[in-house]
C-alpha cells in the first residue's frame, strides 16, 4: 500500500510572481485573490490540496516588500513567520524578469532555514527555452536549492510534475482536513477577498492598497439563497467617489462580478449589498486592521 504524505508548504516571493495564481491552480478553486497590482495578498491563505496519496496545505504569504505603513509591517511579519514550522518552502520567481534586490533579500533569509527550499521559476510561457537555463544557473550561484522546477501557473505547465516532486520530500502523515475542505479560512473571509479582487480589477492605481473589505453580515435565508452585506473601506473621499463611480456604475459592476464568483464558491444564489465608507488612514490603525480581519497568529 502506498504511504500517505501530508505537509505544510509555504510559498514565498516578491509581489506579483504568481503565488496566488499557483494556489488557485492546484486547489481548483479561487481562494487567493489575483490581481496585476502588487501586494494584493494580505493574510496567509491556506489552500488545501487533497489527492488520493497526499494532502498538501499551501500557505500563500504576502509578497516581500519594504513596509510603508502599519499594514505593510503586518504583511511582512506574516511572511517571515510563515517560514517557521513548515515542511517545505517554495521560493517563486518570475522566469521572465531579472533577479532583483527583493529576490536577493529573500535568498539571504532562506540561506538560514533548515527546511527544504524549492526554486520555482514561474511564467515560463513568457520565456524562450534558450533563456531558461542561464536564469537557473544564475539563481544557483546564490544558494543551493533542494530542487529547481520551471512552471507556468497560469497555463498549468509542469504544475503536476512539481507537485509530484514536492510530495517526495513531505513526511508520511494523515489528512489534516476533510476531502472537500479547500481552505481553513471562514467563508466570510474568502467572500471579502473576492469583493476586494473585483475592486482592484476595476479601479486605478491610486486605490488598491487603500481598500479594505469587511463582511458585516452573511445569512443563509433559504436552502438556495444567501444574503451578504459588506462594507468597503477607503481612506479619502476622492477614493470613495472612484469606487462608487458615476451614478453608482462602478460599485454596481463590482457587485455583479463579485456575486458571480461568490455564487460559484457557495453553490447558492447570492443577494449582495455593498456600502463604501471613509476610514481615514486606516492602514496605520492597528485595531482597525484587526477589526477587518487581518489578525496575526498568537505565539
From Swiss-Prot:
An essential GTPase that binds both GDP and GTP, with rapid nucleotide exchange. Plays a role in 16S rRNA processing and 30S ribosomal subunit biogenesis and possibly also in cell cycle regulation and energy metabolism. Its main location: cytoplasm. Residues 5-172 form the Era-type G domain. The gene is era. Monomer. The keyword GTP-binding applies. PROSITE patterns: G_ERA, KH_TYPE_2. It comes from Staphylococcus aureus (strain JH9). It is a peripheral membrane protein. The lineage of its organism: Bacteria, Bacillati, Bacillota, Bacilli, Bacillales. GTP binds at residues 13-20, 60-64, 122-125. The keyword rRNA-binding applies. Keywords: Cell membrane, Cytoplasm, GTP-binding, Membrane, Nucleotide-binding, Ribosome biogenesis, RNA-binding, rRNA-binding. Residues 122-125 are annotated as: G4. GO terms for biological process: ribosomal small subunit assembly. This is GTPase Era. Residues 13-20 are annotated as: G1. Residues 151-153 are annotated as: G5. Residues 60-63 are annotated as: G3. Residues 39-43 are annotated as: G2. GO terms for cellular component: cytosol; plasma membrane. Pfam families: KH_2, MMR_HSR1.
Amino acid at each position: 500500500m502506498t504511504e500517505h504524505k501530508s505537509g505544510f508548504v509555504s510559498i514565498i516571493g516578491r509581489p506579483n510572481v504568481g503565488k496566488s495564481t499557483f494556489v488557485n491552480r492546484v486547489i481548483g478553486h479561487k481562494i487567493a485573490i489575483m490581481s496585476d497590482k502588487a501586494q494584493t495578498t494580505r493574510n496567509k491563505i491556506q489552500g488545501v490540496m487533497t489527492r488520493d496519496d497526499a494532502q498538501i496545505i499551501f500557505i500563500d504569504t504576502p509578497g516581500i516588500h519594504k513596509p510603508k505603513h502599519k499594514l505593510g509591517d503586518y504583511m511582512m511579519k506574516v511572511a517571515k513567520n510563515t517560514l517557521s514550522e513548515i515542511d517545505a518552502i517554495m521560493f517563486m520567481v518570475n522566469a521572465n524578469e531579472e533577479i532583483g534586490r527583493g529576490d536577493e533579500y529573500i535568498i539571504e533569509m532562506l540561506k538560514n532555514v533548515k527546511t527544504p527550499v524549492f526554486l520555482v521559476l514561474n511564467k515560463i510561457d513568457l520565456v524562450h527555452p534558450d533563456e531558461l537555463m542561464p536564469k537557473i544557473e544564475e539563481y544557483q550561484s546564490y544558494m543551493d536549492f533542494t530542487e529547481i522546477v520551471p512552471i507556468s501557473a497560469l497555463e498549468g505547465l509542469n504544475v503536476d510534475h512539481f507537485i509530484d516532486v514536492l510530495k517526495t520530500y513531505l513526511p508520511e502523515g494523515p489528512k489534516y482536513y476533510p476531502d472537500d475542505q479547500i481552505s481553513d479560512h471562514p467563508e466570510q473571509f474568502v467572500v471579502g477577498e473576492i469583493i476586494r479582487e473585483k475592486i482592484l480589477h476595476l479601479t486605478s492605481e491610486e486605490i488598491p492598497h487603500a481598500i479594505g473589505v469587511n463582511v458585516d453580515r452573511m445569512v443563509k435565508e433559504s436552502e438556495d439563497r444567501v444574503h451578504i452585506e459588506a462594507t468597503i473601506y477607503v481612506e479619502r473621499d476622492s477614493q470613495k467617489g472612484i469606487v462608487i463611480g458615476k451614478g453608482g456604475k462602478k460599485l454596481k459592476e463590482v457587485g455583479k462580478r463579485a456575486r458571480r464568483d461568490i455564487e460559484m464558491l457557495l453553490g447558492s444564489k447570492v443577494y449582495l449589498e455593498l456600502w463604501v465608507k471613509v476610514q481615514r488612514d486606516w492602514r496605520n490603525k492597528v485595531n482597525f486592521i484587526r477589526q477587518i480581519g487581518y489578525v496575526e497568529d498568537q505565539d
